[in-house]
Amino acid sequence: CYSTVDVVGLGDNTFTFGGVAGTVGGSVTRCFATGNVQAWMTVGGVAGMVGTRGGSLTDCVALNGAVSGTESRSQRISRVGNVLKSEGGSESGNYAWSGMKVNGNTVADDDVEGSNGADLTYDDPNGLSRQFETIFGGNSAWTYAENGLPTLKNVGGTQSGDLPVWMTSQNKVYIYTAADLAQLAADVNGGNKMSGKTVLLMNDIDLSAYANWTPIG
């Protein structure tokens, strides 16, 4: 399975939101998500929570541009999915794009069994790191193309194999949330060089949670 849509939980007390599933109570294997995910709490690029009634998430890839909470006190925000081990939840063989923003910041990790998964990289000379091909290449359910998204076989409609624009546009900065904008302000006002980069505002931004906002630049 896969999902390319953005997922947003509106208002307070919005729990367990993920790019593919909110709560995983069964077995989810070999899926990917590319849309951005935002909710109040318990947010993951692929699944919000893994573990209800012994759920498992295996060989999945999060290619989301950003996952985030709706406010500064939001908790359990992860690249792949939050694991409820007390209920028998488990994760294994999972990866996430290394450039994904988690509450406005990138998170480096190499744990394929953890909530953030292990880093999967993309660069123009080398393309996608080999883990993506290992998961989807040669599988009977998928048609795999080098350095592109796999598409499901025997499924109607139109499917796109294009990678998310944020993975291939290294000179663009995408602003989806207030946290993204705050990070941009910190980078620019802190002296980090932004020469040659294009900043794109992707959503309306509410800065009411940020008191004494300092203008950018």
Each model region followed by its residue ranges:
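Predominantly extracellular beta-rich ligand-binding scaffolds that present long acidic/polar faces
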Residues: 1-217
